[in-house]
């Protein structure tokens, strides 16, 4: 076992069978329908999906939750019924009973197998219904447990509003109004080739170019092409115009302002172009980018992270998802986005490619170390020096010392289920535990690059071997490795917990970490409580056995 661990000095990645052994991804409905308060989730699947939602979520029928099942029967699967008419009937019933702001269709394995065209039906039905319909595929064939939320947020990101063009131009132009209007500054503008199409229609051209062109310097260049008598020379103190220029100007030190003339209305056009031009490159840093966080968190946890960033002088412009569908954040090229969960790679890709946002690649705010690194990365993007993070992290670790004594030196094995494994492993290594293996259903190394780097750094600082990372692990091989390594704790899915417990392997359900509040500084104890609970149980069993003089410290004999 020692040789096996010593060989792992750097991160190693392996991929085994390619099968998903995880919780069903449609379970994302359980927390998303509570997060988006004016939504309604319609899961389109079979009775199996309905049984899963009823049993796994533990919601009674009379509670009237804001989700429902559209059960597919044999006639639906054999294509004897019109899917559109049936979904239309259900959606109109939902509108009449609940009147939500948005309806989310959740596709399942069945809709994927029979190739239901949900994306094709949704726009037409949306026009008839008058309520937005978001389509997300959360089938267990293609996605792991928590990736159900990823598909929903990726679909919802495309529904986020964009900043109107005139508003965006106005926000950029307001900064330009405060800067110098000298030809030297004008020459530094970003140029976009936009020339006159008809040089004879001067009056029409000027008014058209005033509205069409965002760059005044490019506008002047176009004038030089069609009117040789008009010229601009770069000089710090003056602007030289030829005597035959058709617009009367006056020379002013460092700035030029056209005189309004009743004989020629073109002077007014120049004046507005100068005052409403685009922002210069040297002043681009004055445009304060917005920050949008994506990932579903309980409102209390979201507030905690917001306050942590506010302490650093950073304001959050919005969340994806928002509490109400109408409050979705505005996304544009001046928006920075940062994730709070490691399973949101598809959402991050959509935000970058479709919405042209800038992604902040940071470790995830899980544990004091991860939260500190997450805040530091955001501060670096905004050019702010972090204040008090070292002291805050140290104080949190001191408060966890009673639990750290129990886990320090213990070993843990992740079988893989919820895609939180790398962040949890990094935190537990910082707590003093040894991680033998990190099994994970799916790993996007680009999206989790910062988390992987922090994991490697943590292993180096704690002087422990770097664990092996196995993507889509084979459970049979994992059982063999568990039998060989004999870890103190195995974090696994619900399907494997009881069989492992029957073989004297202490387990913890990974699904509990998904539903627990584990983000931020103050919730680090929640993670340790989940980890130490089975370890404390073993201690109590050992004490019980010693009290009665039993030679067996466990109730079940090893059956390996």
Swiss-Prot record:
* Cofactor(s) recorded in Swiss-Prot or TrEMBL: [4Fe-4S] cluster
What is the native source organism of this protein? Tetradesmus obliquus (Green alga)
Cited function: Component of the dark-operative protochlorophyllide reductase (DPOR) that uses Mg-ATP and reduced ferredoxin to reduce ring D of protochlorophyllide (Pchlide) to form chlorophyllide a (Chlide). This reaction is light-independent. The NB-protein (ChlN-ChlB) is the catalytic component of the complex.
Q: Which EC number(s) does UniProt give?
A: 1.3.7.7
Show the ranges annotated as biased composition (Polar residues). Answer: 196-206
For this UniProt record, give its keywords in alphabetical order, as a comma-separated list.
Answer: 4Fe-4S, ATP-binding, Chlorophyll biosynthesis, Chloroplast, Iron, Iron-sulfur, Metal-binding, Nucleotide-binding, Oxidoreductase, Photosynthesis, Plastid
* Record-linked InterPro entries: LIPOR_BchN/ChlN, Nase/OxRdtase_comp1, Protochl_reductN
The pathway this protein participates in, as annotated, is:
Porphyrin-containing compound metabolism; chlorophyll biosynthesis (light-independent)
Q: Which gene encodes it?
A: chlN
* Similarity-based family: Belongs to the BchN/ChlN family.
**Protein's UniProt name:** Light-independent protochlorophyllide reductase subunit N
Q: What is the superkingdom listed in this entry's lineage?
A: Eukaryota
Q: What does the record note on quaternary structure?
A: Protochlorophyllide reductase is composed of three subunits; ChlL, ChlN and ChlB. Forms a heterotetramer of two ChlB and two ChlN subunits.
HAMAP family, sorted: ChlN_BchN (MF_00352)
Q: Where does [4Fe-4S] cluster bind?
A: 24, 49, 109
């Amino acid at each position: 076992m020692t040789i096996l661990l010593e060989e792992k000095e750097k991160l190693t990645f392996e991929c085994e069978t390619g099968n998903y052994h995880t919780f069903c991804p449609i379970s994302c409905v359980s927390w998303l329908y509570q997060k988006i308060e004016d939504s309604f989730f319609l899961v389109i699947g079979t009775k199996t999906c309905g049984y899963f939602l009823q049993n796994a979520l533990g919601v009674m029928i009379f509670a009237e939750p804001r989700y429902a099942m559209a059960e597919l029967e044999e006639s639906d699967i054999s294509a004897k019924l019109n899917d559109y008419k049936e979904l239309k009937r259900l959606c109109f019933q939902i509108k009449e009973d609940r009147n939500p702001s948005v309806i989310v269709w959740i596709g399942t394995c069945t809709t994927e197998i029979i190739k239901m065209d949900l994306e094709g039906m949704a726009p037409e039905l949306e026009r008839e219904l008058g309520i937005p319909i978001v389509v997300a595929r959360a089938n267990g064939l293609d996605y792991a447990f928590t990736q159900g939320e990823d598909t929903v947020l990726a679909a919802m990101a495309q529904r986020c509003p964009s900043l109107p063009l005139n508003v965006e131009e106005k926000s950029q132009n307001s900064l330009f109004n405060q800067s110098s209007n000298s030809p030297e500054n004008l020459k530094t503008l970003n140029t976009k080739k936009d020339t006159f199409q008809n040089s004879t229609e001067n009056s029409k051209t000027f008014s058209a170019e005033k509205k069409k062109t965002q760059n005044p310097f490019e506008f002047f260049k176009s004038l030089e092409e069609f009117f040789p008598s008009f010229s601009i020379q770069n000089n710090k103190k003056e602007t030289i115009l030829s005597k035959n220029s058709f617009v009367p100007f006056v020379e002013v030190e460092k700035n030029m302002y056209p005189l309004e003339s009743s004989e020629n209305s073109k002077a007014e056009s120049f004046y507005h172009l100068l005052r409403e031009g685009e922002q210069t490159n040297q002043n681009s840093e004055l445009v304060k980018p917005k920050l949008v966080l994506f990932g579903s968190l309980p409102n209390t946890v979201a507030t905690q992270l917001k306050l942590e960033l506010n302490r650093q002088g950073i304001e959050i412009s919005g969340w994806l998802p928002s509490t109400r569908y109408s409050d979705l954040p505005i996304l544009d090229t001046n928006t920075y986005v940062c994730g709070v969960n490691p399973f949101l790679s598809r959402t991050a890709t959509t935000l970058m490619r479709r919405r042209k946002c800038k992604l902040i690649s940071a470790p995830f705010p899980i544990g004091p170390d991860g939260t500190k690194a997450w805040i530091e990365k955001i501060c670096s993007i905004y050019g702010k020096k972090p204040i008090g993070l070292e002291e805050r992290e140290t104080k949190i670790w001191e408060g966890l010392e009673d639990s750290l004594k129990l886990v320090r030196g213990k070993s843990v094995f992740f079988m893989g289920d919820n895609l939180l494994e790398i962040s949890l492993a990094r935190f537990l290594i910082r707590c003093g535990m040894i991680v033998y293996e990190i099994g994970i259903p799916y790993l996007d190394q680009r999206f989790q690059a910062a988390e992987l780097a922090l994991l490697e750094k943590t292993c180096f600082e704690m002087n422990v071997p770097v664990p092996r990372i196995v993507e889509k692990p084979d459970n049979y091989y994992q059982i063999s490795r568990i039998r060989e390594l004999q870890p103190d704790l195995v974090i696994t899915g619900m399907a494997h917990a009881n069989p492992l417990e029957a073989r004297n392997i202490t387990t913890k359900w990974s699904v509990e970490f998904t539903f627990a509040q584990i983000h931020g500084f103050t919730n680090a104890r929640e993670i340790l409580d989940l980890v130490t609970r089975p370890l404390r149980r073993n201690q109590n069993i050992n004490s019980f056995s010693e009290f009665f003089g039993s030679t067996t410290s466990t109730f079940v004999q090893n059956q390996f």
